[in-house]
């Protein structure tokens, strides 16, 4: 029985990402490349991930780090949006990739940029949503139960003491 593709595209692996894994030239869109790279992470295909980086990224020099990221327990991919770039040889894919580590589930959110060169799509770089600073658990309480000491950091996030800021 054929297994479903790790990229979540509702096709079998053989009908989906295996085609790209066997021949990079068969990748027709940035989204297809992004999905095949995610599947390569799930399946441990370090060589595929390295060769689908744009040559300017010198991915071979970062092979060890790439192999470590592939070694994560990847569990789900959500494509948020795929869009064209400023020209036909550029595209963007925004996605969330979920993985488990030390009994916790994490999400990698990225807007990846892909470029097409000599007929091949490559991953070149990505941007990440601004990392939210870890919120103080007291901020999840209702206002009536929030107790802030005068010498505690201000809840507005200014970095000042509460008594010198909002207190």
UniProtKB/Swiss-Prot annotation:
SUPFAM superfamilies: NTF2-like, Sec-C motif. It holds the Pfam family YchJ_M-like. Signal peptide: none annotated. InterPro entries: NTF2-like_dom_sf (IPR032710), SEC_C_motif (IPR004027), UPF0225 (IPR023006), YchJ-like_M (IPR048469). Belongs to the UPF0225 family. HAMAP family: UPF0225. This is UPF0225 protein VP1145. It comes from Vibrio parahaemolyticus serotype O3:K6 (strain RIMD 2210633).
């Amino acid at each position: 029985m054929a297994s479903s593709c790790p990229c979540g595209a509702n096709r079998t692996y053989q009908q989906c990402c295996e085609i790209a894994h066997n021949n990079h030239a068969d990748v027709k869109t940035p989204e297809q490349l992004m999905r095949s790279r995610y599947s390569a992470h799930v399946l441990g295909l370090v060589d595929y991930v390295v060769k689908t980086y744009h040559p300017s990224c010198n991915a071979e020099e970062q092979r060890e780090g790439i192999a470590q990221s592939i070694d994560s327990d990847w569990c789900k991919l959500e494509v948020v949006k795929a869009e064209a770039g400023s020209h036909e040889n550029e595209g963007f894919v925004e996605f969330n990739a979920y993985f488990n580590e030390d009994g916790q589930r994490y999400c990698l959110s990225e807007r990846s940029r892909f470029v097409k060169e000599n007929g091949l799509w490559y991953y070149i770089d990505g941007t990440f949503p601004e990392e939210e600073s870890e919120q103080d658990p007291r901020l999840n309480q209702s206002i009536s139960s929030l107790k802030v000491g005068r010498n505690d950091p201000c809840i507005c996030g200014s970095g000042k003491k509460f008594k010198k800021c909002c207190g």
